[in-house]
């Protein structure tokens, strides 16, 4: 794991600030990747490869980056917004990082190894019926069989999963990349599809700030920002942390997410002095034994769901976050669709 993590870190740094030697070596592979990705999409759009349509509208929320765009809070915000408008929403996802390959409809006993950390987090935050599976269509069928009153499905991270037809496509794009001219496809860059793909989606949500003035891939552009909530105790979520009591304590922050620096910065922006930070690979397994010794250990919500059976120590705290999307993305989605049934 350490060597793999180190190599992945080097590649991610290259994606942010390209190294000439690596670019020379990886550029031909990116060209090959581009041809394969383009052919695959063309085959589905032309009907050469079959795609499946579910009996309810499907809204895909994805990205053309290989993760790290802040998509999960945006999916949660969209689902919550649709629920507030009376729509019975379901969520489907691949369930990346889970140990089982079978389709799984989440329930109160579901764990991260059954569902994946992000789907489990979405399920717990929104209360929306959720199913995971490598085939999104199969996951959707299972979800509708278990919850036939669902009127709309949000497909998390399914932009490139063309085997499932979609009624609305939403792409999340990081604000930090809107002014860049050196973006490239995998493996030389972090893109799964070229920037031109943004021209064909229904909406683009720029995450983490304002877009560059020249970035206008879609006439329907939204912006999202992350707001930190009140830190709560992992063992007792109703107990809120008084951050003032941390003044003379040793605080360690642990994050197993794609962009851990954002999490660490959020804590510092709250006035918390972090003695040490621990960055783990995205979706990494984590247990109580992996947590460092400190007066207070603060973790992400995404990591918190991995402790499904609780934890024996009382010094672990969780920082919740939510995405604020402007203008109203849920209203936009409903305008694009017709006759979405409302919950009774």
UniProtKB/Swiss-Prot annotation:
Enzyme Commission number, as recorded: 2.7.1.130
GO terms of biological process kind: lipid A biosynthetic process; lipopolysaccharide core region biosynthetic process
MF annotations from Gene Ontology: ATP binding; tetraacyldisaccharide 4'-kinase activity
Family annotation (SUPFAM superfamilies): P-loop containing nucleoside triphosphate hydrolases (SSF52540)
GO cellular component: plasma membrane
Highest taxon above the source species: Bacteria
Signal peptide (residue range): none
Keywords linked to the UniProt accession: ATP-binding, Kinase, Lipid A biosynthesis, Lipid biosynthesis, Lipid metabolism, Nucleotide-binding, Transferase
Enzyme's top EC category: transferase
Binding site for ATP: 65-72
Pfam families: LpxK
Catalytic activity: a lipid A disaccharide + ATP = a lipid IVA + ADP + H(+)
Xref: InterPro entries: LpxK, P-loop_NTPase
Keyword Kinase assigned: yes
Listed pathway(s): Glycolipid biosynthesis; lipid IV(A) biosynthesis; lipid IV(A) from (3R)-3-hydroxytetradecanoyl-[acyl-carrier-protein] and UDP-N-acetyl-alpha-D-glucosamine: step 6/6
Similarity comment: family membership: Belongs to the LpxK family.
HAMAP family: LpxK
PANTHER family from the UniProt entry: TETRAACYLDISACCHARIDE 4'-KINASE (PTHR42724), TETRAACYLDISACCHARIDE 4'-KINASE, MITOCHONDRIAL-RELATED (PTHR42724:SF1)
Role this protein plays: Transfers the gamma-phosphate of ATP to the 4'-position of a tetraacyldisaccharide 1-phosphate intermediate (termed DS-1-P) to form tetraacyldisaccharide 1,4'-bis-phosphate (lipid IVA).
Full protein name: Tetraacyldisaccharide 4'-kinase
Lineage of the organism: Bacteria, Pseudomonadati, Pseudomonadota, Betaproteobacteria, Neisseriales
